Amino acid sequence: MNSTREIAWQLLTQYTKGEGLIKHALAVEAAMQAYAHNFKEDQQQWGICGLLHDFDYEQNPHPKDHPRVGAKILRELGYPEDMIYAIKAHADHMKLERKSRMDKAL
């Protein structure tokens, strides 16, 4: 995984300025870490997934763009494909099957 929590935080705050959306990202990060702990999965990876799941939303709120734009950025930055898939699958309009525990938790 080509990220740390600090790098993910920088990415989030680069794209997201609204306090409400940042609080949402932090809450989802915490929830995902708790789910990862329960499932004995990688808490850092799951937390970063939660932190970044809507990072592109403020700049790309239309369903044709979110989370596609964010997924493209994450792929270019070297984030794992399972995380990118979970982020895409969390958006109902993408109509992607939620297969993994990460997909379902997010």
Model-derived features with residue positions:
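Alpha-helical phosphate/pyrophosphate-handling elements in metalloenzyme active cores
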Residues: 17-44, 58
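Predominant activation on well-ordered alpha-helical scaffold segments within soluble catalytic domains
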Residues: 9, 13, 26-29, 33, ...
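General structural signal for secondary-structure boundaries
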Residues: 1-4, 101-103
